[in-house]
Swiss-Prot record:
CDD domains linked to this entry: AAK_UMPK-PyrH-Pf
Pfam families: AA_kinase (PF00696)
UniProt family annotation: Belongs to the UMP kinase family.
Quaternary state and interactors: Homohexamer.
Protein species of origin: Methanococcus maripaludis (strain DSM 14266 / JCM 13030 / NBRC 101832 / S2 / LL)
UniProt pathway: Pyrimidine metabolism; CTP biosynthesis via de novo pathway; UDP from UMP (UMPK route): step 1/1
Domain of life: Archaea
Name of the protein: Uridylate kinase
Main location per the UniProt record: cytoplasm
Keywords: ATP-binding, Cytoplasm, Kinase, Nucleotide-binding, Pyrimidine biosynthesis, Transferase
Length: 225
């Protein structure tokens, strides 16, 4: 199966900083999926690294410039994961989908970050999935699925086990799109998922759930066309 993962930068690089064990555990999960015969692509977010830099830069620069900072942060995080993957990855971060496809055709795990200003890595992963005609898009984030309301500020929010892409659009329609913003799925990614009719799964961004999203026994949200 051809699978694209959107790996949240905040789960790879939590607030407490880089952890060798944490990054190694993600690398092991992606390696295992490759060993099982799946073609694996990972788009890594900027997470806390991006937000820290952007919060300072925003005092001096516009949103477009802050977007560029965020893109660089995603590529630094990507390099960390690439280093842990060793021979299973190519030691460079592609900046466009054609170069990404070349890496996939080398039978390597593809790892990349952001590509364009105003595009989150969720949107990049959805576009990549459409570009390579992937079988599945998995969004691994710091929330364990899609909720009817933001669970981080609504204690009555209800997790949705299964929704369709139109329902996803309704839920994500009012999300923020400023540089460094974070949400379960951003509006642009939702539109691409709907347009491309991508089967998508949103899971808690831990190695166990990443594996489970492909084997079929995950605890997240399944989004169908």
């Amino acid at each position: 199966m051809d699978v694209v993962f959107a790996l949240g930068g905040s789960v790879l690089m939590p607030k407490e900083g880089a952890s060798t064990e944490n990054i190694q555990n993600y690398a092991k999960a992606f390696k295992k999926l490759k060993e099982m015969g799946h073609r694996v692509s990972v788009v890594v977010g900027g997470g806390n690294t991006a937000r820290q830099y952007i919060s300072v830069a925003r005092e001096f620069a516009n949103e477009s410039f802050c977007d560029e900072i965020g893109i660089l942060a995603t590529r630094m995080n990507s390099m960390l994961l690439i280093s842990a993957l060793g021979k299973d990855a190519v030691k460079q971060v592609p900046e466009n989908f054609k170069d990404a496809e070349i890496i996939l055709n080398m039978d390597k795990i593809l790892v990349m970050g952001g590509t364009h200003p105003a595009h989150t890595t969720d949107a990049v992963s959805a576009t990549l999935a459409e570009f390579i005609d992937a079988d599945l898009l998995v969004i691994a984030t710091n929330v364990d699925g899609v909720y009817n309301k933001d669970p981080r500020c609504n204690e009555n929010a209800v997790k949705l086990d299964k929704i369709n892409t139109k329902e996803l659009l309704e839920i994500t329609g009012s999300s923020s799109m400023s540089a460094g913003s974070s949400g379960v799925v951003d509006p642009l990614a939702s539109k691409i998922i709907d347009r491309a009719k991508l089967k998508t799964i949103v899971v808690k961004g831990i190695p166990e759930e990443i594996l489970a999203s492909v084997t079929g026994n995950h605890n997240g949200t399944t989004i169908t066309p």
